[in-house]
């Protein structure tokens, strides 16, 4: 799946950039790297990329600000945030503002490769158990989710989704009225096991509820089943 995929690495650590360029190129990706937001902006005016690996702690504009800015511009490029070990608050904030995944430093390049592949699979609409194209539009309340085109609408108004949000929502709507544990959701949406220390599923659920629920504190469509996980209820009735 690596053929023709272009990866942009944004990190001020020159040695890490060189290592990732070499390793990801060996894995079949086209890789460019820059050291800061200014260089990134100049490059993005000339080239497009399938995915960005973005360091949180950058000189000048930091990774959180870059991610927020790109999402405010409706840039759909998936972003994997690179954070320092122990920066849980920053990881959660990164996911809340639209990062698709994160990886803490120090990391094994193989782990980053696995996460890149998982995000690109989601972006390519390759989730297991997906409905066929003929069954690809899911309607609930005022919303329509097109699983084939990865678009969601509130009545006629488009609602942009990150690849992470789409993956979690797709997993839920593909299993209506079936409570899904965090483990199951993580496996369906990200292709890996859930860690008890990880908050990414909860963060994505919170973001989705803010999009589709009139009262996110009392959700109708994405409900919590205590002790079991989360459940999608198409008609908004009690699970």
Curated annotation (Swiss-Prot):
Name the record gives this protein: DNA-binding dual transcriptional regulator OmpR
Listed result of changing residue 225 to C: Wild-type transcription activation, decreased DNA-binding, about 40% phosphorylation in vitro
Induction data: 1.8-fold induced by growth in 15% sucrose, no change upon growth at pH 5.6. Part of the ompR-envZ operon.
Effect of residue 11 to A: Reduced production of OmpF at low osmolarity, reduced OmpC produced at high osmolarity. Significantly decreased OmpR phosphorylation in vivo, no phosphorylation in vitro. Loss of expression of OmpC and OmpF under low and high osmolarity
Predominant cellular place of this UniProt entry's protein: cytoplasm
PANTHER family noted in UniProt: DNA-BINDING DUAL TRANSCRIPTIONAL REGULATOR OMPR, REGULATOR OF RPOS
Pfam family membership, one: Trans_reg_C
Organism of origin: Escherichia coli (strain K12)
Effect of residue 226 to A/C: Loss of transcription activation, loss of DNA-binding, about 20% phosphorylation in vitro
GO MF annotation list: phosphorelay response regulator activity; transcription cis-regulatory region binding
Ways its activity is controlled: In the presence of 0.2 M NaCl, 2.0 mM sodium cholate (bile salts) decreases expression from the ompC promoter; how this is mediated is unknown.
